[in-house]
Amino acid sequence: MTEATTRTEDQLHIERVFGAPRELVFKAWLDAEQLSMWYGPTGFTAPRERIAVEPQLGGRWELVMIQGDARTEHQLRSRIVELVEPELLVIENEAMPDHGMGVTRTRVEFHDADGKTRLVLTDGPYEKRMGEMAGQGWAGAFDKLASVFNG
């Protein structure tokens, strides 16, 4: 498993290789049951019953992340704006003013890598502090996603 994270002025860019075919990694982003197993930073959960995904252009991509023992809830409301199975998913995320975030866009590319998947995520725009937090959050989520495929 390899990972590279870079930041431009306001965008986060992460590349990571997962030990599963891209069709399976792609599905993990659109199947609520699978999303509940990995989405969110380390210490967060995303309960299955709080996830709504409509895998089509304009479809909802929404979930609630619950933070640790404090049970603090963080709701994400997004729409699918590009969808090319199993190659590309782009979601536009509503603003979260209470977290100091405007509208962001998450672009996820899925590339075949000899039976594995090279995932390329571009996310933002973020101001510096939120971008650093988002990078840490994605790293934790991707660790959990990797464990889904490694049993």
In which residue ranges do the predicted regions lie?
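Vicinal oxygen chelate
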Residues: T42-P47, D69-R77, E92-H99, E127
